[in-house]
């Protein structure tokens, strides 16, 4: 992990309309759902990666959730409604509100360090409380040629 210290900010996150592909399966199979979402994006052009924001919605902690109960949504911002399609991508919305946000730099396999840094260290010291809502990931530099070690992901922890 390349995050040695966390720079955490509190923001008011706006609600964002998204194209959403739910992943309801083992965490190890998440990349298959991601590939499906990428194919949908390329085929339809409705949420192009170079013009739209890309998000992950983490409903569950893969370390503590039974594999068959794991839930994660793959999302891309959109400006128009999503028609029915063979990929299972549908209309959704990311819930707005107050969030603590910190940047994770590096491999996504290590993102739990950033999440737990916010929850276990920053949150108690800040006096803030976590709201019952999923954690959001905003993948800020997805592009051809970006190595995993250089990925930048904003981690949003919902606040009460």
UniProtKB/Swiss-Prot annotation:
Record SUPFAM superfamilies: Probable bacterial effector-binding domain (SSF55136)
Keyword Repressor tagged: yes
Keyword Transcription included in the entry's annotation: yes
InterPro entries documented for this protein: AraC_E-bd (IPR010499), DNA_gyrase_inhibitor (IPR050908), GyrI-like (IPR029442), Reg_factor_effector_dom_sf (IPR011256)
Pfam families associated with the record: GyrI-like
Keyword field: Repressor, Transcription, Transcription regulation
Gene3D superfamilies in the cross-refs: Regulatory factor, effector binding domain
SMART domains: AraC_E_bind
Superkingdom, natural source: Bacteria
Function: Represses expression of mcbR.
Protein name according to UniProt: Probable transcriptional regulator YgiV
Naturally occurring in which organism (per UniProt): Escherichia coli O157:H7
Name of encoding gene: ygiV
């Amino acid at each position: 992990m390349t995050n040695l210290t966390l720079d955490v900010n509190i923001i008011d996150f706006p609600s964002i309309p998204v194209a959403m592909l739910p992943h309801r399966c083992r965490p190890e199979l998440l990349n298959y759902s991601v590939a499906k979402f990428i194919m949908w994006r390329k085929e339809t052009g409705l949420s192009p990666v170079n013009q739209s924001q890309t998000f992950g919605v983490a409903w569950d902690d893969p370390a503590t959730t039974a594999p068959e109960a794991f839930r994660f949504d793959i999302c891309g911002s959109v400006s128009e409604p999503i028609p029915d399609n063979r990929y299972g991508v549908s209309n959704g919305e990311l819930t707005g509100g107050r969030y603590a946000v910190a940047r994770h730099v590096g491999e996504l396999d290590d993102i739990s360090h950033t999440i737990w840094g916010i929850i276990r260290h920053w949150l108690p010291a800040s006096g803030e409380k976590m709201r019952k809502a999923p954690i959001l990931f905003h993948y800020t530099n997805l592009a051809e040629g970006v190595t995993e070690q250089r990925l930048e992901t904003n981690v949003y922890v919902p606040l009460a």
